[in-house]
From Swiss-Prot:
Source organism (scientific name): Cereibacter sphaeroides (strain KD131 / KCTC 12085)
Recorded name of the encoding gene: gpmI
Disulfide bonds: none
GO terms for cellular component: cytosol
Gene Ontology biological process: glucose catabolic process; glycolytic process
Superkingdom of origin: Bacteria
Record keywords, A-Z: Glycolysis, Isomerase, Manganese, Metal-binding
Pathway: Carbohydrate degradation; glycolysis; pyruvate from D-glyceraldehyde 3-phosphate: step 3/5
Residues engaged in binding substrate: 124, 153-154, 183, 189, 254-257, 330
Name by which UniProt lists this protein: 2,3-bisphosphoglycerate-independent phosphoglycerate mutase
Function: Catalyzes the interconversion of 2-phosphoglycerate and 3-phosphoglycerate.
Length: 506
């Protein structure tokens, strides 16, 4: 029996399953294709959180974690757990890169600038990592300025006051908050440089809104109608900007939303916007490595481990062709993260990125660029590729807005694209796995507060086999089982590094 061609992995980003219909965009939306597949095709569920994806118990998954595990075909220990462990066991203060940072800042008589997410969301950063770093640096007698990035997306939309209060209560005498900035400005990943400039101008030059203290900055933003994600860059007290000899330490452990702001703050030759005169930093440190380009001007406390024989690498090594497609918001996930943290395409790997719409928030255009993704996906299905990986961003990105009606519209647009993909795969004689990397839009109201729910969930996600082998059934599993499943459909052996198990029971 010949292998189906192409084999398609269709990732419905943020499409989780929840029995209750209330505030459940997936259940309330009109999804004839998804409903038909669930009724007629082999299906099961996958776990996308906690130890099953290399995270601490109870920690929700996210797109970086999800796509890394999917591409690796094994559970990959993620940075959050590794950093938590280093802090818990006491090795963090002795981290060699951190010791080097301390030595350089001390030698120059500088101040340490720490930028980090002030929440316990654990997707891009964690308040406890920030507090621990402050303690270490202050313990060395180094003055510390914190650039507090408020969240409101991976935690409740108006929880920043609580987190900022938690932070300032434990600050040693030599540490202070210099700026308070919503992640909308400081953590863009779509080249919206006007936003990034406002964030970096506040950190570098102390320009923006002003408040007497950090808690007042949050309160003033709320009074202006800004929830935590959107807090306008605010300078706190008499903070006057960064100076020559200072050091900069980024506490974010996820790359995609740290790259732009770090480039603006420290990349030599940066010209995407006018940064003004930047300081001559004595040291520039990241919690992790963010890209090859960033490695040229900064060091990493916890470099990423090398993941060998990912799905893409293994398929390429067998001389087969593959195609990756997503819109801008999720393009790094189906390329960089799926390939184990490598930017360059594999041999025989083609890519297409649809430009995400330039709107302030995606509830304003819930279809996003899904029609363009669908057009190019259908074209690719008929183009002779062996493996295609596609990500539909809408359920996650619109889910993050907390707008139920918009999330339903997003789900319906993706279902239309899914219908086109199923038809094209069937015509081509291919097979498809439909799944998600984590949940989100199936829970649009916070059950505890009754307000909008904007974060990911720990709900199971679907996995559906379309046009699989006759009599095949699926069993429940985790994201690391997807690559072995795809390889089985492609009739390729599984590399020994992949410890996941195929979900197909023939």
């Amino acid at each position: 029996m010949t292998a189906p061609k192409p084999v398609v992995l269709c990732i419905l980003d943020g499409w989780g399953l929840r029995a209750e219909r209330e505030a459940n965009a997936v259940a309330l939306a009109d999804t004839p294709t998804f409903d038909r597949l669930m009724a007629t095709c082999p299906n099961a569920t996958l776990v996308t959180h906690g130890p099953d994806v290399g995270l601490p118990r109870g920690q929700m998954g996210n797109s970086e974690v999800g796509h890394t595990n999917i591409g690796a075909g094994r559970v990959v220990a993620m940075d959050l757990g590794a950093i938590d462990l280093a802090i818990e066991e006491g090795s963090f203060p002795q981290n060699p890169a951190l010791r080097d940072f301390i030595a350089k800042v001390k030698a120059n008589g500088g101040t340490a600038h720490l930028m980090g997410v002030v929440s316990d969301g654990g997707v891009h950063g964690h308040i406890q990592h920030l507090i621990s770093a402050v303690e270490v640096l202050a313990g060395e007698g180094i003055p510390v300025v914190i650039h507090a990035i408020t969240d409101g997306r991976d935690v409740a939309p108006t929880s920043a006051g609580e987190f900022v209060g938690q932070l300032v209560r434990v600050l040693p005498e030599v540490a202070r908050v210099g700026t308070v900035i919503g992640r909308y400005w400081a953590m863009d990943r779509d080249k919206r440089w006007d936003r990034v400039k406002r964030a970096s101008d506040a950190m570098l030059h102390a320009t923006g809104e002003h408040a007497p203290d950090a808690e007042a900055a949050v309160a003033a933003a709320l009074a202006r109608g800004e929830t935590d994600e959107f807090i306008a860059p605010t300078v706190v007290g008499d903070y006057a900007g960064a100076r020559d000899g200072d050091g900069f330490f980024c506490l974010n452990f996820r790359a995609d939303r740290a790259r732009e702001i770090l480039a603006g703050l420290g990349q030599p030759g940066f010209d995407s916007y006018d940064t003004g005169t930047r300081p001559d930093w004595s040291a520039f440190l990241g919690m992790v490595d963010y890209s090859k380009e960033h490695d040229r001007f900064m060091t990493a406390a916890y470099p990423k481990p090398v993941i060998r024989n990912t799905l893409g690498e293994w398929v390429a090594s067998h001389g087969l062709r593959q195609f990756r497609i997503a819109e801008t918001e999720k393009y790094p996930h189906v390329t960089f993260f799926l390939n184990g943290g490598r930017e360059a395409p594999e041999t025989g790997e083609d890519r297409y990125m649809a430009n995400s719409p330039k709107v302030a928030t995606y509830d304003l255009q819930p279809e996003m660029s899904a029609p363009d993704v669908s057009d190019h996906l259908v074209e690719a299905i008929g183009a002779g590729y062996d493996l295609i990986v596609v990500n539909y961003a809408n359920p996650d990105m619109v889910g993050h807005t907390g707008d139920l009606k918009a999330a339903m519209a997003a789900v319906e647009e993706v279902d239309r694209g899914l219908g086109r993909a199923v038809e094209a795969v069937t015509t081509a004689g291919g097979a498809m796995i439909v799944t998600a990397d984590h949940g989100n839009c199936e829970t649009m109201v916070d059950p505890e507060t009754g307000g909008p729910h904007t974060a990911h969930t720990t709900n199971p996600v679907p996995v559906i086999l379309v046009n699989g082998p006759a009599g095949a059934r699926l069993h429940a599993g985790r994201l690391a089982d997807l690559a072995p499943t795809l390889l089985q459909l492609m009739q390729l052996p599984q590399p020994e590094e992949m410890t996941g198990r195929s979900l197909i029971d023939a």
